[in-house]
């Protein structure tokens, strides 16, 4: 459980990452994790008010009785009718909600990459070997979905590790598209629909950029709107660590599909499902907070440990 606390900043112990808040003439102390403290330290000046979620229970820490800070909601300085807002998570969430509700076609994209061999992998360079995407119109209706295998360029044969992990055979790669063929199909799709491209993490955009450079093709990624759903989740829920795609799916549907196929189209489908769940959160149709996120992920970890 968490408590909501707000009050005037009374003092800061930078070495111990503790802030003191004064409420009704009473001073209480709160401990912040290193990353959080570094992010907000610039705002901790005299006259600042801090609004935050903290742990319900107290503990002793290096001479203080403290509660751990879970999340900072707002940092402001009152100036009569015109307070100065230094940080407000509600404004940030509003911006994320605006992105999520943008009325334009959306392309949910995922790649599978070649993997290095078990030995002699020093000169190995990964390549896109499978593409999966789902295209929706501005209303969210699916208008296309495709899956392609892509022929490798630098290493003609995929490694045994790739075959085992992705459950793919060399024949499937050999019968796939040349990257230039995929490039033509993909750029035509982008020009036709001008979609928002939704990915989980930054790797897909980075790998596309590398492949375009490797094949001496014009790089379209700077002029394409890529939206990283992982980054939006970390910002919206104030997550300290990266969240895996299938953990995110579990948050919304509590259905464990960890035994994934390692298939690009399947991962694109999961990305779309996560988008749909997150959109409901942004539009207040589903309740999900930092606390419930941690609780659900903890439950999933316990289930997996029990199964093992």
Segments from the language model and where they lie:
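Acidic two-metal-ion nuclease catalytic site recognized across multiple nuclease folds
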Residues: 273-308
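Short, glycine/acidic-enriched loop or turn micro-motifs at the edges of active sites
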Residues: 111-115, 231, 270
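Active-site-proximal helix-loop-helix substrate-binding element of RNase H-like nuclease domains
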Residues: 150-165, 173, 231-268
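N-terminal accessory regions of nucleic-acid-interacting proteins
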Residues: 1-104
């Amino acid at each position: 459980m968490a408590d909501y606390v707000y009050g005037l900043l009374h003092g800061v112990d930078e070495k111990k990452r503790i802030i003191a808040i004064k409420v009704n003439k009473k001073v209480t102390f709160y401990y912040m994790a290193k990353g959080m403290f570094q992010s907000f330290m610039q705002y901790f000046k005299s006259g600042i008010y801090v609004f935050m979620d903290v742990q319900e229970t107290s503990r002793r820490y290096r001479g203080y009785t403290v509660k751990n800070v879970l999340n900072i909601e707002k940092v402001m300085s009152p100036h009569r009718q015109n307070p100065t807002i230094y940080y407000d998570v509600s404004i940030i969430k509003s911006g994320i909600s605006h992105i999520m509700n943008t009325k334009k076609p959306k392309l949910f994209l995922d790649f599978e990459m070649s993997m290095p061999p078990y030995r002699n992998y020093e000169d190995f360079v990964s390549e896109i070997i499978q593409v999966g995407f789902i295209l929706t119109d501005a209303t969210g209706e699916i208008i296309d979905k495709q899956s392609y295998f892509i022929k490798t360029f630098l290493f003609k044969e995929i490694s045994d590790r790739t075959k085992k992990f992705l459950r793919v055979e060399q024949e499937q790669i050999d019968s796939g598209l040349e990257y230039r063929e995929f490039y033509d199909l993909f750029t035509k799709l982008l020009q036709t629909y001008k979609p928002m491209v939704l990915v989980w993490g930054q790797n897909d955009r980075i790998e596309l950029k590398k492949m375009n450079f490797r094949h001496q093709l014009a790089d379209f990624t700077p002029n394409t709107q890529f939206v990283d759903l992982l980054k939006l989740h970390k910002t919206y829920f104030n997550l300290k660590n990266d969240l895996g795609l299938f953990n995110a799916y579990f948050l919304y549907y509590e259905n464990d599909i960890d035994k994934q196929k390692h298939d690009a189209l399947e991962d694109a489908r999961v990305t779309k499902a996560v988008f749909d769940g997150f959109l409901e959160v942004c539009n207040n149709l589903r309740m999900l907070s930092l606390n419930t996120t941690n609780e659900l992920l903890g439950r999933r970890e316990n289930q997996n440990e029990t199964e093992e």
